[in-house]
Amino acid sequence: MIQSRTHTCGELRLGNVNERVTLAGWMENVRVVGSNFAFVVLRDFYGTTQIVVETEEMMNIIKGINKESTISVTGTVRERASKNAKQPTGEIEVVPEKIEMLGRCIYNELPFEINRSREADETQRLKYRYLDLRNPEVKNNIILRCNVIAALRKAMLEHNFLEITTPILTASSPEGARDYLVPARKHPGKFYALPQAPQQFKQLLMTSGFDRYFQIAPCFRDEDARGDRSPGEFYQLDMEMAFASQEDVFSVIEDVLPPIFAKYGTYNVASSAPFKRIAYNDALEQFGTDKPDYRIDLRIQDITKLVAGSEFAPFAEGNTVKAIACSGCELTRKHIDKLCADVEVQAGFKPYWFKVEADGSFAGGVAKFMTPHHDAVVEALGLTPGTLIGIAAGKKSAAQKTAGVMRKMLGALVPGHMDKERYEFCWVVDFPMYEIGEESGELEFCHNPFSMPGGGAETLRKAIAGEIDPLTITAQQYDLVCNGIELSSGAVRNHDPEIMIEAFRLVRLGEEDVKKKSPAMYNAFCYGAPPHAGIAPGVDRMVMLLAGEDSIREIIPFPMNKNAQDILMGAPGTVTDKQLEELHIKVDIDE
């Protein structure tokens, strides 16, 4: 019979000296220093403890055990002669009188060294994820995730939100990302879908009379992976509030998130309420993106008019010219060229540059085309000697994007322009309700068609009557951004069927189209719905930020790879002909 452990491997201290204890864990390492003398590192979830083998009997047992086997050790605690101040248990060691095998590792060689697993090939790490997770550094990310979710749940309950789970099997919503479909055995030819988000259900809860809802919601989208996006499955802090405005949502988020970021983050500084706010169009103008990183003090400025008439082709009439002035820049020509090449790869458009010399003259890059406009440019940009000016030129959207990428890279490269060790939140507001479609050339919804338009029905009717330009209509939508990463989108919902119909009329759709897109929600709203608003910050992205990781896969216990494959479990995989027959499915693959 296995003896229960009396302590964990991270627990023993000098106060336990002379106690008889039983520990259990993985045999991490063995260092033999004599015929009957060895040091063993025993590891469990809580830490490591040094075991000192001093007898022939114990040495013979240890010699027959492979690393990463699980063992039980019973022995006496004593003070270490050579202490390790870096280790919590570094002042003690255990001298064993009994060692039992619990779970044998049958392999002499491991796929990778446990404590250096992050250096291994990612495919190997995912294939042997259970070994990868034994690495304390990897394991700590999962512990962090658990703590953050617990803190989010506690905070939401304290704000009088009810945690309500919503269905996992639901109807397909093809207007969003691709759905994961689930065949319905009892209904041949029909399919459920895994929810891309609990959007309609949470709005139906508001219509049902619930006042404040939340859940740590699993969401499923068949989309490609990115560094900050896991394919397949992700989780979000989903919330909705009845009889609420944008300000009510902001108030809750600004109260809930900063303490959690300050407590659990790599950096212990997080912006407090109220968060900075910026309109969508202003964000594009000043930051070159709708995901502004306020830690960087550089701002983009428009110099189109200042360089009018320039002989430089990219500055030609009809193009937009943007500038970023970065003072105190000591980058060499080689580094500047590398910077510009990196910007072009990321933005897809070529940037330009010049510098201000000690005597105030312009040099390098496109200096000869800027010199004729010297005084005006110096005054407009507030230039001083040693300043590097990044230039982006082209169509407005291209110039904004290129300048935005260059701004971020300069902020990270040039000392003094980025306060990296903090979490800086901001709200992006006043998104356009409509846009001209690139392919159709006609008016289309810009983002969420079910958001409440600014000005409500009256604004829509004026647009339909031709009294105002529909492109000037803003939606009551908002994004939550932290350190240049979008954590969530949210909105004040359009809860009025009449306003919904007016909003769709502008894009040449009618009442039947509204009903077809969301029949249950539309019908529910016809029975009297409260004004409501919500948001859903991504849990995975929050934890990634808090852990200081660049890849979202590092904070997910069992992530898929970039190709949406679960290498560990072999998913997706084939199924039997009998299973397919029961589901009335025939697989036809083009060879």
Put a short name on every predicted segment.
Residues 1-591:
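Class II aminoacyl-tRNA synthetase catalytic cores and aaRS-like
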